[in-house]
């Protein structure tokens, strides 16, 4: 690992940096999002994780960015994931309990959301969205799987996320 990379990304462990670059993310995109290595229980708790989730430290911390350009929430990728109850497969990503769904948009792509002439990619997962961003594509990452385009209203009804009001879709090429 070169000295310059460590200087640019001082809050990211070499293992986490290697994982991200192996997933086709550039160091600029990694730095702009603010990926970080979280090594302690306290660091995970301050990001909204439950006590059970916080015990999974160390983890890759993934800040989430909303359609208005605000950092709003976190997703975590524990180094040693816990098994899902339903099928015992690893739960690779953790989202703090109670955190609401949002359309995640890399900070460098915020200004392109309202331009219907810019092609748009919609994908499941921040890392995939950031890989597209690393290659110049405007991408929205859905949180919470393929149903991440929607949320729940105060009465428990399923509704489209209000974030969609910031995304121009008229005549836009969307994948």
Where would I find each of the regions flagged by the language model?
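Short, small/acidic-rich helices and loops at N termini and domain boundaries
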Residues: 1-64
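Phosphate-handling DNA/RNA-contact segment within nucleic-acid enzymes
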Residues: 45-173
């Amino acid at each position: 690992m070169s000295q310059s990379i460590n200087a640019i990304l001082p809050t990211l462990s070499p293992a986490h940096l290697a994982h991200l670059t192996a997933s086709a993310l550039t160091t600029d995109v990694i730095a702009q999002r603010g990926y970080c290595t979280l090594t302690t229980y306290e660091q995970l708790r301050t990001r909204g994780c439950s006590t059970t989730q916080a015990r999974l430290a160390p983890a890759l911390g993934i800040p989430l960015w909303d359609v208005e350009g605000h950092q709003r929430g976190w997703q975590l990728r524990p180094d040693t994931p816990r098994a899902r109850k339903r099928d015992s497969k690893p739960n690779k990503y953790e989202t703090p309990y109670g955190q609401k769904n949002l359309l995640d948009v890399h900070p460098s792509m915020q200004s392109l959301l309202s331009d219907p002439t810019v092609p748009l990619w919609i994908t499941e997962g921040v890392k995939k969205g950031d890989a597209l961003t690393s290659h110049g594509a405007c991408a929205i990452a859905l949180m919470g799987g393929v149903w991440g385009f929607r949320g729940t209203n105060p009465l428990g009804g399923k509704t489209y996320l209000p974030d969609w009001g910031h995304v121009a879709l008229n005549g836009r090429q969307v994948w």
